[in-house]
Amino acid sequence: AMLLQAMKPVTPYEMGETEVPGMYTISIDGLGSKPVEYTVQLPPDYDPYRSYPCIVALHAEGKSPVDQIQWWCGNLNKRMNMRMGQAGRYGYVVIAPKWTRDGKTNYGFTVHEHAAVLLSLRDALKKFSIDSDRVFLSGHSEAGTAAWDIGLAHPDLWAGVIPIVATAEKYIGRYWQNGRQVPFYFVMGEMDGNQLEINSGEFNRYLQRTGFDTMIVEYRGRGHEHFQDEIHHLMRWMRAHRRAFTPEKFTCSTLRPWDNFFFWVEVDDLPEDSIVMPIMWPKQNVRDVEVVAEIVSDNRIRVKTAANKITIYFTPDMIDFEQRVSIYTNSSNTTKAIVPSTEVMLEDVRTRCDRFHPFWAKHEYSRSR
């Protein structure tokens, strides 16, 4: 694990001369045969032996990934031959995936859109030196809605989520419990139609219930805008937040088969009557699948969920590998030795691309049907 942390990125990107120093557009394999493209802007004097915080910035409808790079990093100063914006000043790597579907401008809550964002992040973790505990997700307008949804669906990935003029739609209301696990910073305008009314149900949950870290900023007399004047406050907020990688206790919900990894628990084979694909929305009388997990004292782990397959991953922060571990999964109880495995560790780094927090071992459980 220490060797993995000390390594440079696994497949460092060959950085040649570009028109804008430190900006590269990269194409990778997406789902199926469709490639995914993302643009990355590195901070000045980028050094692969250091680790940098990161912003995954999703562009609004009708905009491009470069527009998001410019929002966070500023325009190119031709005299200085560098961008002079806030992200570069604070040493952030900015990743801007081309997440929209061909011919579509609205966010569809689909697996392809999630994959475009998550695969871009994972590829960037392979190629660039990114601090995986300080990765923030942001988006404007429809992309703000996407950031809100993806942030709730995959709360284990983010140090914080920044939806700007976003709308609470579809799964966002059903995944509200997941919001306890990730900080949110919302920005909106008072005159932006009835956005506050639409979002008020979720905002009330986040502000009135315990365990949420939520900031909501409303600009008086302003409408549906990009709100770049908020960027200094955003930088201060991000500086104060880091991801909690192995929370001792969490409850998360899922309705989609690809929203199945939460911190140190992976679930598969969800009950058919609890799956709602985006094209089927709204589906009546559907109960989401809850994943309730807890690290208890004395080397005990508890996981309860309606999913039929559970994989629990372990790190030294969670258990003492020299002692036997008691694992409670649904109605099954077992006490066994959990042995660290190099194979598990390397496979985990290959798939999740998180060199700073590899899992050392895993335990698999399948419910008998």
Describe every region a protein language model picked out.
Residues 1-52, 333, 339-356:
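A domain-start/cap signature at the N-terminus of enzymes
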Residues 44-50, 104-141, 157:
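Gly/Ser-rich "nucleophile elbow"/oxyanion-hole loop immediately N-terminal to the catalytic nucleophile
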Residues 53, 58-60, 165, 188, ...:
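The conserved beta1-alpha1 loop
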Residues 54, 58-126:
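Active-site machinery of serine-nucleophile hydrolases
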Residues 125-126, 133-180:
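Primarily recognizes the serine-hydrolase "nucleophile elbow" in alpha/beta-hydrolase
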Residues 179, 185-188:
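Short beta-strand/loop motif that positions the catalytic acidic residue
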Residues 193, 197-300, 305-309:
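C-terminal catalytic histidine-bearing segment of alpha/beta-hydrolase fold enzymes
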Residues 258-369:
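C-terminal beta-sandwich/jelly-roll accessory domains of carbohydrate-active enzymes
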